[in-house]
Amino acid sequence: MDASVGENPVAQSIAQAMIEGFNKHYRIFRETSRRAKESFEAAEWQAQIDAVRERVQFYDERVDEAVRRLHEEFDADSLDDSTWQQLKLQYIGILMRHKQPELAETFFNSVCCKILHRTYFNNDYLFARPAVSTEYIESYPPVYSSYYPQDEGLRTTVRRIIEDFDWQRPFANLDRDIDNILRAVHEHIGAWPDMEVNCQIQVLYSAFYRNKTAYIIGKAINGYQEYPFALAVRHNPAGRLEADTILLDPWRISVLFSLSRAYFLVDMEVPSGYVHFLRSIMPNKHRSELYTMLGLGKQGKTMFFRDLIAHLRHSNDQFIIAPGIRGLVMLVFTLPSYPYVFKIIKDVFGASKNMDRATVKRKYLMVKQVDRVGRLADTLEFSYAALPLSRFHPELLDELRALAPSSFEIEGDSVIIKHLYIERRMTPLNIYLEHADDDQVEYAVREYGNAIRELATANIFPGDMLWKNFGVTRYGRVVFYDYDEIEFMTAMNFRRIPPAPYPEMEMAAEPWYSAGPMDVFPEEFATFLLGAPRVRKAFLKHHRDLLDAKFWQDVQASIRKGYLEDFFPYPTELRFCNMWSNERGRAHQAA
């Protein structure tokens, strides 16, 4: 691409229109994130949930606006090759001083891909690789603030860190909170080290808001040691603020950013700076996952696909049919050397599935819009994804031709998949249980029931609750990942099975009672879930009430009253109110 910049005024005008479209998108994105602080202060929890749900649509709305503008003002379909080449160069020039160049490049790609034929997707017209560096972009306010405990003491420094967030709601007892923070840190590190000359605490400027909690994210640096932390701040029952816990293990902070959780609301002028800081405390987190959890899902998808293509260049294994029981709706395949599964909607569903392709897509979108409470796997959705034909095992190609012929094409040396979902690979729960000892079975079944309970209180009914539709994560958490029958709890009708008019009817092949499309009889769960003796024993020990319609009806009643359950992305025993409860109890008795 050797055309010089500045020769094509049409390209210059289009580039300006494109950046205006992106800037509008990011302005709305930041306004939504800024309002999260106000909602947190006012305890408007539903507003937080609504903001996350609505934000999912922002990007596509702005892309569609930009596409319409390019068609109406510039007759985009008739642009020649020279103009497309100049357009990218002009756009790069605009981005040289931009605060979000990587996001703006992705926006450019999204707009162009709606206009260009896909044969152009990997050429010089698009950003196949980043063109503008995201290193050292200046920001005001800065990405993070630095505090120096040598100057004013550790206790005063911790107080100032918290007070600098300027929440317009008082703390119930900030001195007590600081005591708890310092005690938890002391117990974690064992002994206070001497302060080195570089001793400092770096804290990301914006708090991270999700549901009812605000998180202060940072790290302490002392000599060659770094100590990451995430401080959770919540409202107490009286409506005042209090520090709920401080997470100090990097893996626990990583769980906070799990894709099975709702996205954060964070006000960022320079998102790449936030991602860079977060990776310094969670080096095993991919940048694509961090962008996604910050609400920048399209950027997460862009970076994920670049990582996948890079992995394919440096590996030689083949895509194969995923192990486990085949699904009735999805064809699932995987690349053994890459920790993800790829899901394609079949052309024809199993006989028991009364739905169409549009319904399935709507259910997967629903999962992105709700609070996943750590129990629903997030998905990346792609259209016209090109993967190398040579990497597809012949059995997988045969399966694609037989079950999803309308969903892919072979063009040259590429397989073009027209619509694709990608999820983190997990161990299917049914396979986990087959190889588990008694203790592992009890743990997994308890986790399974807890997942169902937490989803229910978050207004999510899984629908198909077979063990094969749940997976076990690398942290041992049970997560649901089959969404074609998922529904809102409030849409369901949970019923008890009525008595049989005659005893012999209980032995009949067909039920003696009628059932509507949204009717659920929890008593029936035992029939298809509890066939294995070890599983049955553990389930009845921990979750017998899930077989009673009353449990489900009570949860529905709570949801309809507007009650929002508390979901903690960390063990409740790590909450300050529980960590030293025995000592408080003894002190109270002594008094």
UniProtKB/Swiss-Prot annotation:
Catalytic activity, as annotated: L-seryl-[isocitrate dehydrogenase] + ATP = O-phospho-L-seryl-[isocitrate dehydrogenase] + ADP + H(+)
Alphabetized UniProt keyword annotations: ATP-binding, Cytoplasm, Glyoxylate bypass, Hydrolase, Kinase, Nucleotide-binding, Protein phosphatase, Serine/threonine-protein kinase, Transferase, Tricarboxylic acid cycle
Family: Belongs to the AceK family.
Top-level taxon of origin: Bacteria
Role according to the record: Bifunctional enzyme which can phosphorylate or dephosphorylate isocitrate dehydrogenase (IDH) on a specific serine residue. This is a regulatory mechanism which enables bacteria to bypass the Krebs cycle via the glyoxylate shunt in response to the source of carbon. When bacteria are grown on glucose, IDH is fully active and unphosphorylated, but when grown on acetate or ethanol, the activity of IDH declines drastically concomitant with its phosphorylation.
Residues holding ATP: A322, P323, G324, I325, R326, G327, L328, K343
UniProt EC number: 2.7.11.5, 3.1.3.-
Lineage: Bacteria, Pseudomonadati, Pseudomonadota, Betaproteobacteria, Rhodocyclales
Catalytic residue positions: D378
Keyword Coiled coil: no
Subcellular location: Cytoplasm
Name assigned to this protein: Isocitrate dehydrogenase kinase/phosphatase
Coiled coil: none
Gene Ontology terms for molecular function: [isocitrate dehydrogenase (NADP+)] kinase activity; AMP binding; ATP binding; phosphoprotein phosphatase activity; protein serine/threonine kinase activity
InterPro entries, alphabetized: AceK_kinase (IPR046855), AceK_regulatory (IPR046854), Isocitrate_DH_AceK (IPR010452)
Any one GO BP annotation for this protein: glucose metabolic process
One Pfam family it belongs to: AceK_regulatory
GO-annotated cellular components: cytoplasm
